[in-house]
């Protein structure tokens, strides 16, 4: 199949990624509608605020035509509780002059004759002198609206004074007028009762009325709600798209979705252009709706200014925010942080809006450098543009800014440093700045795995030409702690591994490019640097971790190479290095001649590989059919063949019935099948399958095995798995890693013959219905004796139906004659069938893993406790097989006794003790290393736990 390249591939990837963005937005309708139509709610809110301001003004008499003012007749003294912000307990009024009997009677009459409400005596305070009143007022603020001061001059003259707080207060939009509310009622009451007292007629009528002059309504140029609240609301509206865009980009990075596309060969240019185009369309639509809604609600800002000018301001500003979101997404690694950063950007923009409103720094009094730095933050330039357009429509007589006057300075100045035309130029320039910076950051800032390009990667000719993939580049490894220490290379202990390493080194030295070799690994090493943590009064530093320690290996075409190993062996790290996910610390690997340490090389490699990662990397909102169409387009399949290829792969992995179901609804096994199909799309030359059948049912697993077997032709496959059956059936060669090193390599039969315990003989018996009461041992004792006499072995498993024996390799020369005799005596022993085979691959795997654990435990001192049946506790290294018991030497056992320890892997993949044999004699002439012990330990002290003796047999 011929794949597309160059510009046709770029266009195909762009359209596929654009379609993906469109589909994801469609399936997240709520967020998309919010981004497009949120402007309506902001405009509506501004409109409601402005109408409320107009209604508040209309309720005031100052803004009404008064032709016949209302007459106010004898207003009463109000309760003190009616005063705004009064403190309790309060008093309706206080008075001075209580040394005069006549004055006291006048005040009593004021209280009794108050219109509509007599004033209780406990609501009035009396004093002798005005100074006493002042003193009381100072010590009791806001507890009384006013005071009356009386002086009896003579029998016909009584003078008085009114004292009130002339400060007006506002509450809930209403202003309190102390003159008409408190002063006038006190004055009217005092004059009325003084007149009655002087005339001696308590029924003397005293009526007083007053009204304001007739006048027209006051016409003022009130401040528009849009001019006050608009800049903040417009910024908040634009932040919806910014936060959603930033969150989407960071989520794709966090969930490794972009990494999956990168491994399949997506162009960075196609990725960024697809996002820019889609977000640009959303921005254009949302900006258009904002302006239209503003015109519908009849705001002068939108009606008087040129439609194009207003639309361009919002459009270019939101484009700037897209560029800023791109740049920030290269730095942020967690989607949870994206919302926080978005709020922080809004908060900073909110603050700088007020600074920009003062004219800073867009005036000739500020240096150009300040304007440049200030304008790099998009909300600042946006605020300046809003100010120009708002000022142009600030009064009813203002005509706004037309398109032809866009370059004219504010106020008709001959020269200025800012105009709406200059604002547009700034917005265009800063968008390009942020967009280019985003692409640069995306290449040089290390991702979660530490991969980056050199700082001046764009100066390398290969970056533009795509050539030079076999040249190793510096700068592809990043570490925040400086240089990473390399592990020392050790000569392999295994002869097959040494032979493989020697062959690869010789080919590299001779410059031989074997066309039958797909992958050639040259001393691959990966070390994770230690970390430093500052705690309370101490600094904790961890040592570097060597995940892969010098791997040399060839992987041939048309073969499946299976890489086995316990958890932490380095399998997934090796695959991550080969696919370019993780940078290598040392060594290199050539995949069809391209180096994984070259950015050009890894780009070429990704065009010819397929990857099924250890953990599924899928979009929950996309179906399996849509996944395959997307990755087929990224790979460069001809458009005409994409549909048929996807249908075939879905049929191969039995997902045809669920082709249109979203992946988020799939089970774990279905997701793994989809990941396998994605890895095989585009006819890759090299396929990485990292535990591909995890979570599958047995029937589906067998079916996927058939697919993998059929896929070997014309390509190399690298498989990792924890299923020994899967490795045994599928692999042409097997390599077992442990502790970062390759421990053995070869075919399954080769490994079984070298590292297995021997041959496994299974003898099945003829069913005998008459021996129900005969024990197993009694019925098969002759056969057990036959094996014991000839091969010196005991059964490892036995029951009525069969018996299993493990025969050591050193008995191989006896097997031909032994089994000929056994076949001749089948009827004597009641045998129905005899099977002979090698040890299982699982046994080989456990032996290799156990030996690696023993080496590590011996070097690092990792010990576990072995509890013997006798109650003795022994401290033994992890992985030790034969362990001698100290101080058990006697005449019968001159070398002491030992036990064989059985090991297995626990749920986490770590080695743990599963049991041990009975005590047996230590063979003579076997060198042993005794544990350090200052004193001879008796049997009693063994119960307290001592170090066992490792015996190498």
From Swiss-Prot:
Keywords: ATP-binding, Membrane, Nucleotide-binding, Transmembrane, Transmembrane helix, Transport. Residues 519-764 form the ABC transporter domain. It comes from the Eukaryota. GO terms for cellular component: membrane. SUPFAM superfamilies: P-loop containing nucleoside triphosphate hydrolases. GO terms for molecular function: ABC-type transporter activity; ATP binding; ATP hydrolysis activity. It is a multi-pass membrane protein. The chain crosses the membrane at residues 33-53, 230-250, 277-297, 307-327, 341-361, 417-437. It is found in: Membrane. ATP binds at residues 565-572. Belongs to the ABC transporter superfamily. ABCA family. CPR flippase (TC 3.A.1.211) subfamily. This is ABC transporter A family member 11. It comes from Arabidopsis thaliana (Mouse-ear cress). The gene is ABCA11.
């Amino acid at each position: 199949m011929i794949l597309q390249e160059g510009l046709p591939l770029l266009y195909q990837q762009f359209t596929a990624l654009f379609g993906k963005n469109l589909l994801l937005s469609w399936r997240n309708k709520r967020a998309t509608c919010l981004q497009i139509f949120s402007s309506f709610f902001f405009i509506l809110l501004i409109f409601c605020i402005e109408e409320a301001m107009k209604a508040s003004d209309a309720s005031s008499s100052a803004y009404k035509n008064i032709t016949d003012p209302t007459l106010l007749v004898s207003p009463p003294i109000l309760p003190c509780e009616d005063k705004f912000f009064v403190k309790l307990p309060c008093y309706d009024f206080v008075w001075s002059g209580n040394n005069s009997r006549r004055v006291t009677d006048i005040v009593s009459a004021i209280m009794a004759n108050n219109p509509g409400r007599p004033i209780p005596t406990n609501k009035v305070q009396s004093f002798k002198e005005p100074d006493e009143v002042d003193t009381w007022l100072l010590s009791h603020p806001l507890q009384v609206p006013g005071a009356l001061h009386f002086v009896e001059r003579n029998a016909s003259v009584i003078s008085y004074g009114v004292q009130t707080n002339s400060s007006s207060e506002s509450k809930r939009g209403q202003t309190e007028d102390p003159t008409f509310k408190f002063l006038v009622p006190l004055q009217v009451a005092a004059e009325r009762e003084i007149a009655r007292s002087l005339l001696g007629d308590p029924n003397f009528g005293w009526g007083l009325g007053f009204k304001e002059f007739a006048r027209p309504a006051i016409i003022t140029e009130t401040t528009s709600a849009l001019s006050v609240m608009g800049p903040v609301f417009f910024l908040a509206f634009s932040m919806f798209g910014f936060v959603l865009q930033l969150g989407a980009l960071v989520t794709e990075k966090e969930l490794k979705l972009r990494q999956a596309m990168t491994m399949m060969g997506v162009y960075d240019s196609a990725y960024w252009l697809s996002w820019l185009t889609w977000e640009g369309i959303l921005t254009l639509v949302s900006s258009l709706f904002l302006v239209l809604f503003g015109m519908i609600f009849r705001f002068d800002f939108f009606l008087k200014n040129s439609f194009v000018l207003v639309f361009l301001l919002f459009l270019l500003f939101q484009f700037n925010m897209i560029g800023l979101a791109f740049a920030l997404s290269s730095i942020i690694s967690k989607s949870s942080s994206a919302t926080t950063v978005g709020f922080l950007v809004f908060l900073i923009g909110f603050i700088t809006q007020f600074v920009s409103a003062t004219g800073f720094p867009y005036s000739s009094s500020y240096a150009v450098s300040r304007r440049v730095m200030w304008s790099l933050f998009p909300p600042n330039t946006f605020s300046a543009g809003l100010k120009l357009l708002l000022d142009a429509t600030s009064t009813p007589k203002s005509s706004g800014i037309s398109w032809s006057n866009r370059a004219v300075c504010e106020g008709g100045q001959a020269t200025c440093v800012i105009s709406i035309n200059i604002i547009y130029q700034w917005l265009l320039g800063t968008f390009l700045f942020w967009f280019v910076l985003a692409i640069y950051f995306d290449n040089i800032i290390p991702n979660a795995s530490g991969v980056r390009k050199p700082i001046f990667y764009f100066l390398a000719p290969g970056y533009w030409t795509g050539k030079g993939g076999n040249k190793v580049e510096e700068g592809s490894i990043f570490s925040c702690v400086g240089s990473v220490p390399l592990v020392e290379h050790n000569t392999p202990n295994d002869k097959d591994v040494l032979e493989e390493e020697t062959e690869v080194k010789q080919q590299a030295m001779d410059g031989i490019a074997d066309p039958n070799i797909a992958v050639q690994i040259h001393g691959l090493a990966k070390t994770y640097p230690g970390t430093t943590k500052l705690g309370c009064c101490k600094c904790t530093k961890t040592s570097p971790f060597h995940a892969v320690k010098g791997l040399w290996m060839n992987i041939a075409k048309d073969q499946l190479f299976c890489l086995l190993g316990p958890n932490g062996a380095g399998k997934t790290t090796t695959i991550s290095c080969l696919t370019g996910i993780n940078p290598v610390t040392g060594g290199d690997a050539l995949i069809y001649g391209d180096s994984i340490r070259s950015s050009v090389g890894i780009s070429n490699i990704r065009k010819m590989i397929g990857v099924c990662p250890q953990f599924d990397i899928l979009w929950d909102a996309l179906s399996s059919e849509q996944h395959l169409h997307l990755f087929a387009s990224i790979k460069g399949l001809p458009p005409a063949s994409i549909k048929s290829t996807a249908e075939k792969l879905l049929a191969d992995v039995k997902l045809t019935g669920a082709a249109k179901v979203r992946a988020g609804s799939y089970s774990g096994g279905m997701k793994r099948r989809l990941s396998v199909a994605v890895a095989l799309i585009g006819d890759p030359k090299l396929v990485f399958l990292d535990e591909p059948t995890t979570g599958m049912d047995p029937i589906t697993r067998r079916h996927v095995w058939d697919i993998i077997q059929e896929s070997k032709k014309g390509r190399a496959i690298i498989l990792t798995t924890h299923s020994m059956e899967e490795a045994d059936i599928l692999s042409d060669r097997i390599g077992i890693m442990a502790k970062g090193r390759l421990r053995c390599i070869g075919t399954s039969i080769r490994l079984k013959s070298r590292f297995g315990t021997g041959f496994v003989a299974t003898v099945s018996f003829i069913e005998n219905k008459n021996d129900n009461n005969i024990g197993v041992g009694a019925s098969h004792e002759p056969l057990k004796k036959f094996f014991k006499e000839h091969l010196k072995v005991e059964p490892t498993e036995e029951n009525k139906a069969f018996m299993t024996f493990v025969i050591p390799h050193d008995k191989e020369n006896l097997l031909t004659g032994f089994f000929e005799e056994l076949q001749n005596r089948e009827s004597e022993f009641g045998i129905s069938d005899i099977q002979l085979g090698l040890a299982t691959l699982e046994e080989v795997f456990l032996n290799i893993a156990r030996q690696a654990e023993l080496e590590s435990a011996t070097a690092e001192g990792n010990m576990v406790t072995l509890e013997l049946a006798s109650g003795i506790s022994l401290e033994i290294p992890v992985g030790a097989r034969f362990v001698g018991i100290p101080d058990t030497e006697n005449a019968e056992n001159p070398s002491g006794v030992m036990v064989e320890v059985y090991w297995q892997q626990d749920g986490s993949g770590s080695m743990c003790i599963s049991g041990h044999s009975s005590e047996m004699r230590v063979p003579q002439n076997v060198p042993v290393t005794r544990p350090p012990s200052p004193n001879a330990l008796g049997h009693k002290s063994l119960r307290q736990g001592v170090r066992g003796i490792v015996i190498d047999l």
